[in-house]
Amino acid sequence: FHAEGEFYGEFGDFNVKFDIPSSFIIGASGTVIDGDPGWNSVTVDTSIDFNKWVENFESTYIAPDPSSRRNITFLAENVHDFAWVASKDFLYEKGKHNDIDVHVLYDKGRGEDWTKVVLDRSIRAIAWLEDKFGKYPYPQITTTDRVKNGGMEYPMLVMNGRASEGLIVHEYGHVYFYGILANNELDDAWLDEGFTTTQTSHYLMTRYGDHGFDKSENDYYQKFPSKNFPLESDLHQDQWSAIRLMRSGHDENISRPSYLFKNGTAYSRNAYTKPSLMLTELRYLFDSDSLYYAAMKYYYQKWKLKHVNEERFIDAMEEFTQQDLNWFFDSWLHTTNHLDYGISSFKKIKNNNNKWSVDLGIKNYGSRFMPLKIETKLADGSIDVRWWENHKWRFSDTFSYELDSKPLSVAIDPDVQTVDLDYRNNTTKMRNTIIFDWPGLYYNPRDQYVYRWSPQFYYNESK
């Protein structure tokens, strides 16, 4: 027995018959093939105000005889787990994405937070996953309420403790990564947690901007002074979290089995945060969202409804892209090597043909290797972008190139997509930001110097 780690099982078909009190409403993996789960009797009319509907519902609802029973049969085909949940207090809403039924069951007491919102978010989540990774192979997916906070995933069913959009997208991601692509969560926790963490971040940043959440629905950011706070990139926050561990001297390999991590923090960073950042770097390496997601679709199509592991994932990436990627994955997964590039020199000379020659000194202060996007800002207002690819096994190099206009500044990895331990030496001109030092303000972007100011008042005691 290992306390850390979750599931691993064989694919099969589950035909499960329930005999429960008629007062209970039930949801489960699979589809109803016989009996009444009780949904129709508690379906919310979302065309009217929720509280008005509850008032009407409570005045007209006829509770079942306490001694009566209901029999329901669920069939779940080609899954490696089965889960169910039942409650006397469930209400029900239903929607559809293409040919997929989307069910939502929630506690009446949380209805104001859940009604309509969770169904909309659930439909958007499954639409996103189908678009980015591939067609969902099951006929339904169900989002249900749970007593505790947080979430838990099963094939075709997730149990969520709140209406959070990020939580819904994360748990639906698990239906793909764990459910459809079935990794051993004891040995390769990163293959599901890391994948759904990065796709959740990308979804939220795509929908709401780099800060990665809906500011209008966050009460904290509707009040003064926090409504005026600058918002930090969600990616930067994850990078800082990983960097703190890397600098601590207590970092561990991502590939380590879950039960061997020294503590919960090490497990969390190495199952969730670091592999998510690794996949962000893979997207950066491909220099194309379309190539990255095309490769992911290839992996998904090849291994859906089968068991996956590290080797099968890496092979799929290499097969599709026709690139050797072992150097990239090996350092991320099997070492604690870190990335730390810097600009060691920047020489610019106007040559005889009225162009500018640049010699950019690049130094690797770390122990991991990456190609680097080089961005040069020019006097004519344009920006030159190119790649330095002489990276493998090199700790220093001079990158020479020619420009039509005078270069003003240079940055390596200008969009801060890599987990470079010290970004300050990645640019010849770091941006400066001056902000008022509000109580409670946390703002620590990786690509800026932040200067905080606040008034201070003193007085002298009179004599």
Residue ranges and their predicted role:
Residues 423-442:
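Short beta-strand elements
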Residues 1-15, 19, 439-463:
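Compositionally biased low-complexity segments at domain edges in trafficked proteins
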Residues 414-426:
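Short acidic/polar inter-strand loop motif in beta-rich domains
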Residues 27-28, 339-414:
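Beta-strand-rich binding/interaction modules
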Residues 319-321, 364-366, 420:
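Extracellular acidic, Ser/Thr/Pro-rich low-complexity tracts
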Residues 74, 103-360:
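Hydrophobic alpha-helical and helix-loop surface patches within well-folded domains
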Residues 2-169, 198, 210:
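Hydrophobic helix-coil surface modules that form long, contiguous segments used
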